[in-house]
């Protein structure tokens, strides 16, 4: 009885170990912008989703595998600094619940199958998936994260790939201003978002010797740089107007509110509360923007003229 109970407990833990290794939370959050890019392409080119059911399924499966592979590789490489930081010290690669060799092979297999599934949509989607994975693992995880205050900027390009992949899975041309705008918005969005996290986790990053901007340059420099990026975010929102004035206005409003919150909060709150308010609004911003893109696109597909 005792041995059976131990086995059952171990089996219950396996899904959790796998989920933490491939970072299922990040996978879920990235599937939303991927689907936004996908539905926007369907809307732009007046394609019924029912005509593209295989491509839609393959895009989801391929994206899940590629993003999961990135998580596995990141956990594998970062296990030394993850062991120092409170929020990452219980990751399976740190605790030994999964061996480095297993994490490596998991990442390799997920990469191969992820690229295959994306290639079943279009070759461009697979190429973009590979570029995103490579940029996240090599320039970001293996180099810039530990060496420069611009690590967030370098990592942001890979983090902005999902909408491009979604669009490319439907139509193999990502030069339309609307999808370029969505891509750049996702790049810029990451700086205020991750700066806010770094302020709140300042001591952990400092202990792990990770040169995040707030750790190295302080809160005032971070405040200035955050506002610069938010102004850029406002300007880039105009690109969405090439496809929809409504989407452009939603993006403009959200970005202006974010900038106003940053300026007001910095003057009225301590740095911890200011960072928390920016972090919460960053989640609100991205959720509302991409949900609006998806709803607008689907309504246009099914009810548009």
Swiss-Prot record:
Signal peptide: none annotated. PANTHER family: PROTOHEME IX FARNESYLTRANSFERASE, MITOCHONDRIAL. GO terms for molecular function: protoheme IX farnesyltransferase activity. NCBIfam families: cyoE_ctaB (TIGR01473). Interacts with CtaA. The chain crosses the membrane at residues 22-42, 53-73, 94-114, 115-135, 154-174, 179-199, 230-250, 283-303. One of its GO terms (cellular component) is plasma membrane. GO terms for biological process: heme O biosynthetic process. Its main location: membrane. InterPro entries: Protohaem_IX_farnesylTrfase (IPR006369), UbiA_prenyltransferase (IPR000537), UbiA_prenylTrfase_CS (IPR030470), UbiA_sf (IPR044878). The keyword Endoplasmic reticulum does not apply. Carbon 2 of the heme B porphyrin ring is defined according to the Fischer nomenclature. It is found in: Cell membrane. It is an enzyme of class 2 (transferase). Coiled coil: none annotated. Converts heme B (protoheme IX) to heme O by substitution of the vinyl group on carbon 2 of heme B porphyrin ring with a hydroxyethyl farnesyl side group. It catalyses: heme b + (2E,6E)-farnesyl diphosphate + H2O = Fe(II)-heme o + diphosphate. The gene is ctaB1. It is a multi-pass membrane protein. Pfam families: UbiA. Its EC number is 2.5.1.141. Pathway: Porphyrin-containing compound metabolism; heme O biosynthesis; heme O from protoheme: step 1/1. Keywords: Cell membrane, Heme biosynthesis, Membrane, Transferase, Transmembrane, Transmembrane helix. This is Protoheme IX farnesyltransferase 1. PROSITE patterns: UBIA.
